[in-house]
Regions:
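Acidic-glycine-rich active-site phosphate/pyrophosphate-binding loop
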Residues: 19-30, 80, 84-106, 314-329, ...
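Glycine/charged-rich beta-loop-alpha catalytic/anionic-binding loops adjacent to active sites
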Residues: 29-36, 96-113, 135-141, 323-337, ...
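A short, small-residue-rich loop immediately preceding and capping a beta-strand
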Residues: 40, 64-67, 113, 134-151, ...
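Cofactor-binding active-site loop characterized by glycine-rich and histidine/acidic residues
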Residues: 41-164, 309, 323-324
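Non-catalytic terminal/interface segments that mediate subunit docking, oligomerization
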Residues: 65, 250-368, 373-383, 482-484
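A glycine-rich helix N-cap at a beta->alpha junction
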Residues: 87-97, 163-177, 379-391
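Glycine-rich ThDP/TPP pyrophosphate-binding loop and its adjacent helix/strand module
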Residues: 110-266, 272-274, 284-288, 293-295, ...
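Peripheral docking tails and interdomain loops at the edges
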Residues: 271-282, 396-398, 418, 537, ...
Length: 594
């Protein structure tokens, strides 16, 4: 097997075309071996195998710099840069290799930590400028998928690359897909370029000032080598537009490109899930509710009664449970605006101003891409749009580029935004209905990320614009204020304290953005210690606001949350333990302070 011998992509330069095609086949099988056992991005990587082999055959990494956009197509690159063991070995070997471009893992060949989209051209222009200033001659190559071109930063990068005017190569990997289908006017031109084999009169890239080459056979190594050789050493901004097939070489991934963009482990022989145990048996898993399905079903029912209700997604419709069938059912009442969170935040503000009721579902990790628009375009204008925040907390994505721990500090720092944290399914939908029906302020709701928890207790249906905490149990001496996904943790801590003879007060704060001064003031009469629990970064978070409120008073405050940090591929229990957030650790800490 060739790929087991590859320690450097220079190995490829001694191979003939037949051998390069064997390397491509081995690389594809290695990628499939990994994703079938470990999960990960399937379709984008399979479609870029041949291009990666050709890139490393023609160019001279690490001297020449490859910059991957979003990293969804970087697995073949890892195989060919000495990391095949992370694709051929056991699951422990696979755990050692990130699913994203990572200099921490391989500083020689991975130039940037990358996981969010539309960044590669901008990053590459920085390398372009550095090369020009130093007077060196390396090729700078940005690799970007057609889906990532819907993000505004890609436009900014193209603009700057053209302005610099020196050699940079932008490889557009056009597989006619984002995660789902593409959305945006630029895709009309990409389609025209494909249909005309790059010869149509109106060429978006030429209008930017780029030299342009088109290759229809984007999964043909011989053709790829030819086109890459033709641009190697260019002294002009150049686009190489290659037409590839998402999922190429694996029939299930080709047949359902959206479903096979990313996935959990599967059975390689037929693509079925769940993956069988080593002894061939099928794991027994009980059907589980999920908030995406519940949300999309609820929205579709409500849409029939309210034609102004609009579901908004930004390139990730699955986050909202809007499958192809549900998108079709919603019709004009669902809009996906591509991977363009800045556009989404501003657009929902405009929708609300125009009399619509938009609900934008966005992953916690992507909120940081649009902080300014939420603050400026939405909150300053007090337009009553709803942001449905999914995946916030420790039980979510755990790669360093995708950690979902910062939404509370970010959103709660913006004046004029209400940020609600439901603790149960029933409370979530009550908050969602109120947020849609009210007409005074933008409201964000942090969807619980610890699974769907139900309650038989009645939930409030009105929430108001000033924070009002809900006292679930009145005790004394110790008060536990546990927000959102950590409310059940608060219940566990209160129960354990009871076993230690402490009757703790338990509070569901519901509001993350501000403090309920009346409730907090009332605790001063018969409490010595307030414990806050939040499922996210505590620096600048919910608990620190409560600690600030008590300030110079005699009240002790124990702030429970995750310390600010860039955590990579963390184990949830270890992260909780390292931050003293296991139930028993919290109890022991409380006992030390009373």
């Amino acid at each position: 097997m060739y790929i087991e011998k590859i320690k450097s992509p220079a190995f490829l330069k001694g191979l003939n075309l037949e051998e390069l095609n064997i390397v491509a086949d081995e690389t594809r099988q290695a990628v499939l071996n990994r994703v079938s056992k470990h999960g990960g991005h399937v379709g984008p990587n399979l479609g870029f195998v041949e291009a990666t082999v050709a890139l490393h055959y023609v160019f001279d990494a690490p001297k020449d710099k490859l910059v991957f956009d979003v990293s969804h197509q970087c697995y073949p690159h890892k195989v060919l840069t000495g990391r095949a063991s992370g694709f051929l070995g056991n699951v422990d070997d696979m755990n050692a290799i990130s699913g994203y471009s990572s200099p921490a893992e391989c500083p020689e060949y991975d130039n940037f930590e990358v996981g969010h989209t539309s960044t590669s051209i901008s990053l590459a222009t920085g390398l372009q400028k550095a090369r020009d200033i130093k007077g060196t001659d390396e090729n700078i190559i940005a690799i970007i998928g057609d889906g990532s071109l819907s993000g505004g930063e890609a436009f900014e990068g193209l603009d700057e690359a053209s302005e610099l005017g020196t050699g940079i190569i932008v490889i557009v990997n056009d597989n006619e897909m984002s995660i789902a289908e593409n959305h945006g006017g630029i895709y009309k031109n990409l389609r025209a370029l494909r249909e005309s084999r790059g010869t149509c009169e109106h060429n978006w890239f030429k209008a930017w000032g780029f030299e342009y080459k088109y290759l229809e056979e984007g999964n043909n190594i011989e053709k790829l080598i030819e086109v890459f050789k033709s641009v190697k050493g260019t002294d002009k901004p150049t686009v190489v537009h290659i037409h590839t097939e998402k999922g190429h070489g694996y029939a299930p991934a080709v047949a359902n490109k959206e479903a096979w963009h990313w996935g959990l482990p599967f059975n390689l022989e037929d693509g079925s899930r769940p993956r069988k145990n080593d002894n061939g048996t099928i794991p027994q898993t009980a059907p589980q509710e999920d908030y995406g399905t519940l949300f999309s079903d609820w929205m579709l029912r409500e849409m029939k009664q309210d034609k102004t209700l609009i579901a908004v997604t930004a390139g990730t419709p699955a986050a909202a449970g809007f499958t192809v069938d549900k998108r079709n059912e919603a019709g004009k009442q669902h809009i996906d605006i591509g991977i363009a969170e800045e556009q989404a935040a501003a657009m929902i503000s405009g929708m609300a101003k125009g009399g619509l009721h938009p609900v934008w579902t966005v992953y916690s990790t992507f909120i940081q891409r649009t902080y300014d628009q939420i603050a400026q375009d939405l909150c300053i204008n007090s337009n009553p749009a709803v942001i449905n925040v999914v995946g916030g907390g420790v039980n979510s994505m755990n790669d360093i580029t995708h950690i979902c721990l910062f939404d509370i500090p970010m959103l709660c720092s913006i004046p004029g935004l209400i940020y609600l944290a439901p603790t149960t399914c029933e409370e979530y939908f009550a908050m969602l209905r109120w947020a849609i029906q009210q007409d005074q302020k933008p409201v964000a709701i942090r969807v619980p990320s610890n699974g769907v928890v139900h309650t038989s207790e009645p939930v409030d249906t009105e929430y108001g614009y000033e924070p009002k905490y809900k006292v679930i149990h009145k005790g004394k001496n110790v008060a536990i204020i546990a927000a959102g996904s950590f409310f059940q943790k608060g219940e566990n801590v209160a129960r354990l304290l009871t076993e230690n003879g402490i009757n703790a007060t338990l509070i569901n704060p519901r509001y993350l953005n501000d403090v309920d001064t009346d409730t907090l003031e009332g605790l001063k009469t018969d409490h010595q210690l307030v414990v806050t629990l939040e499922d996210g970064c505590k620096d600048g978070g919910f608990g620190e606001r409560i600690a600030s409120f008590y300030g110079l008073s005699d009240m002790k405050v124990l702030v429970g949350g995750i310390k600010k940090g860039l955590y990579d591929r963390f184990d949830v229990n270890k992260l909780l333990s390292d931050n003293n957030l296991l139930d028993e650790q919290i109890v022991n800490e409380i006992l030390l302070h009373i």
